[in-house]
A protein has these predicted regions:
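Subtilisin-like peptidase catalytic core
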Residues: 24-34, 39, 43-54, 73-82, ...
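Extended low-complexity, serine/threonine- and proline-enriched intrinsically disordered segments
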Residues: 54-90, 186-206, 585-653
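Subtilisin-like serine protease catalytic core
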Residues: 264-297, 302-352, 402, 427-429, ...
């Protein structure tokens, strides 16, 4: 099979010419009832009274219920934001609401009381003006009249503020102060709204005093029941999210244990193999492969461990070290791996708070380990409105330490096929793995996504065993007695950890590219990310060769870059031309690791990177105008902007998702496309939740595959053309990579 290519060259960048939309406008044909504006005014008066009686914080928290999933450009511009600075900086939380199966945004703003008073004054002026105009409803024509003719000075309001307020009122359904009084009798992990006040100082205002070791981040902390009750009594408005601090390991069943004398034949010791980190229950050092595993018990010495506390973790490490021995049909060609195994839990359950503190310390102490396997998870379903604090902490760790977590998708012991995944499988930047049986059908114990009603989780699936027949299960070593047969997502994840470690440590790819290759190979030309959210993008191929190669009629290559500006692009990918046509189907997979902020709720990822890929067209009128004809008709980042509803942008183009996979459907009726310039192009567009340039410098990776409609191999033509246009072309050669790795790890003795 031909080897995948890696193209290296310069990307260009530029800023947008303009936003393309101008001032605030009502959607075409829509109106705002004056009675609705009066309702919002009444609600705001009640809110003002509430906060005049609450003096423990300096400002006011106000929740805005929008009428739908709202784009950044349609958030409030005047209502509640009559103070200096961008309105986005006032947002402290975001979540989804539902009514009659209709989904909408709820944003919580932290504003001044003066801001509320100004908004009340402006709303009153709006109502007075349109009452005087004898208007029961307001249309765009009325706003156009204001733009052209202005507003009498007696109303003490500018026309811009008037128009912005009316448009705000169209998109806003209601206003309120939310209070969290849900009773929990166990220790709780809570998230509070970020008010810019030191956490301990803020809690002391309510006679709550905690040590630093119970503070996870500036807004996430661990409270005892009496402390939570006190906070709910005195400041229920401050709690953004809460849940019990106890996650029970979803232990995967061990069945049909047998002994095999040949299980440990011909097993040599380790050399320079890459190391994978395992965070799990404990490791039995009496097993045959113990020389390959460095084990540390990170629990308190006061915790007495039982025999059961070693089974799960030992089984997971056995797959990573020597999985193909007992599972020859899953021989991936990756060889063996060393393991650094950290015991962070017992078989009976664990405090997720304590475990995550251990994990952060472990990662910081082991910077050489880039792939970490976490086959533990919660029985409890994830919230539709919040990323779990466990997942949020893992996402923070990944950004801070440049590592990649592989997380089991958790199991449903009741086999309902509708139970949502459990924390931390909602980690956005991690690779979350579900199980399939040997026929690639979803396992009976499958749990499903999505996360935050949007993000695809699980990412991919792999063979984790199912049923009662050993032929359909995963062979592992859990103790010194021999082989055991198991099933569960816990035993699918380690196989993916092996592949990622091979790609990163042996092949020498970065984590973006490794993750993109795994997802792209799983999705192929017939992605599985359907409405069931059970298998992710698909089932990853067994052989590592299939992940980093291509078919004879394909051109498959890797592009790596960094976000340089609003637009980062290349218009010079020389796709072969036949009779002035491009006879190819195309697909592309983009992966990047955005910063994530749990206190932003459903607006969790801070950066959107939009992907456009397709033929390049040069304007005949103005040759300086160059555009891409995207293979998926994505026009949301065109320089001549077109309005697309936020729901459509999310559903069709995965806006705000950190993985973009676009693919053309192969059909016998497909025809080659006209070659305009002879080039294809890539353009990525960076958009921020909050104004600024936080994404600048952020790396991304794209895997592109072109499949010849006529079945002809034109790889060499493509390579030659790339060289002509200053692309450096390398092939990803497994054998060469292994040889280079072995030579680089050889110890050299110098003569005295």
């Amino acid at each position: 099979m031909p080897k995948i290519l890696q193209l290296k060259g310069e990307f260009s960048s530029k800023r947008p010419i303009s936003n393309g939309f101008g001032g605030a406008k009502l959607p075409s044909g829509k109106t705002v009832l004056l009675s609705h504006i009066k309702e919002l005014l009444d609600q705001l008066v009640v809110i003002e009274t509430y906060w005049k009686n609450v003096t423990d914080i300096e400002g006011a928290l106000v929740s805005v219920y929008y009428r739908s999933i709202i784009a950044k450009s349609n958030r409030v511009r005047s209502l509640l934001v009559q103070q200096s600075g961008p309105p986005e900086e006032l947002i402290r939380g975001a979540k989804f609401g539902w009514h009659n199966n209709h989904q909408f945004h709820i944003f919580t703003y932290y504003i001044t009381l003066e801001n509320i008073a100004k908004s009340i004054s402006i709303l009153s002026a709006v109502i007075s003006y349109f009452n005087d105009q004898n208007k029961d409803s307001i249309a765009q024509d009325d706003l156009n009249h204001i733009t052209q003719n202005g507003i009498p000075s007696s109303y003490n309001i500018s026309k811009t503020v008037m128009i912005n307020m009316v448009v705000d009122c169209y998109y806003v359904d209601s206003l309120c102060v939310e209070e969290n009084r849900v009773q929990i009798t166990e220790n709780s992990i809570i998230s509070i709204y970020n008010l810019g006040i030191d956490t301990k100082e803020l809690l002391s205002r309510f006679d709550i005093r905690i040590m630093d070791n119970r503070i996870i981040s500036e807004t996430t902390l661990n409270l005892y029941p009496d402390e939570l009750a006190k906070l709910q009594s005195r400041a229920p408005y401050l709690i953004a999210m809460q849940l019990e601090d106890f996650s029970k390991i979803n232990m995967d069943e061990l069945i049909n244990t047998d002994n095999h004398a040949n299980y440990i034949e011909d097993f040599s010791g380790p050399n320079n193999e890459p190391i994978i980190g395992v965070l799990d229950t404990h490791f039995d050092e009496s097993v045959y492969f113990s020389e390959w595993v460095e084990y540390e018990n990170r629990l308190s010495s006061d915790i007495e461990l039982s025999r059961l506390d070693y089974y799960h973790g030992t089984a997971v490490s056995s797959i990573i070290v020597d999985g193909p021995r007992g599972n020859p049909l899953l021989d991936d060609g990756c060889g063996r791996f060393r393991v650094k195994h950290f015991g962070v839990a017992t078989s009976q359950g664990f405090s997720s708070f304590g475990m995550l503190r251990m994990i952060r310390n472990i990662i910081s102490e082991n910077p050489e380990i880039k792939v970490w396997n976490l086959s533990l998870g919660s029985v409890r379903e994830i919230s539709p409105n919040f990323i779990s604090w466990e997942a949020a902490e893992l996402d923070r760790i990944q950004n801070q330490y440049d590592v990649l977590f592989v997380i089991a998708g958790t199991n449903d012991s009741e086999c309902t096929h509708c139970k949502r995944i459990g924390a931390p499988a909602d980690s956005i930047n991690s690779i979350v793995v579900n199980s399939v049986d040997r026929y690639k059908n979803e396992a009976s114990y499958t749990r499903v996504g999505p996360v935050l009603s949007f993000f695809y989780k699980p990412d991919i699936s792999y063979f984790g065993g199912d049923g009662n027949n050993p032929d359909g299960l995963i062979a592992v070593c859990k103790d010194s007695l021999g082989v055991s047969y198991v099933s569960g997502t816990s035993y699918a994840a380690p196989w993916i950890s092996r592949k990622l470690a091979f790609l990163i440590h042996i092949v020498g790819l970065d984590r973006n590219t490794a993750k993109a290759l795994i997802i792209d190979s799983a999705a192929g030309w017939s992605r599985s990310d359907d409405i069931s959210h059970a298998k992710g993008y698909g089932v990853v191929p067994v052989s590592i060769t299939d992940i980093i190669s291509m078919q004879n009629d394909e051109i498959r290559f890797i592009l790596n870059g960094h976000i340089q500006d609003y637009y980062t692009y290349s218009y010079q990918i020389p796709v072969p031309i036949v009779n002035n046509m491009h006879p190819y189907w195309a697909r592309a997979t983009l992966v990047y690791f955005p910063e994530c902020h749990q206190n932003q709720g459903v607006d969790y990822t801070s950066t959107e990177v939009d992907l456009q890929f397709g033929r390049v067209q040069v304007s005949e009128v103005d040759p300086s105008v160059i555009s891409i004809i995207p293979i998926n008709n994505n026009t949301q980042s065109d320089e001549v902007r077109q309005y697309i509803y936020e729901e459509e942008a999310r559903a069709q183009y995965r806006k705000w998702d950190n993985v973009k996979h676009i693919v053309e459907t192969q059909s016998s009726r497909s025809r080659a496309r006209k070659a305009y310039s002879g080039f294809w192009g890539i353009k990525v567009t960076a958009k921020e939740r909050i104004n600024g340039h936080n994404s600048y410098g952020m790396p991304f990776s794209i895997i592109i595959t072109l499949k010849a409609m006529d079945g002809i191999n034109r790889i060499q033509t493509f390579i030659d053309s790339c060289h002509a246009y200053n692309w450096v072309v390398n092939t990803v050669d497994i054998d060469q990579a292994i040889q280079v790795h072995e030579q680089s790890e050889v110890e050299i003795d110098f003569d005295d």
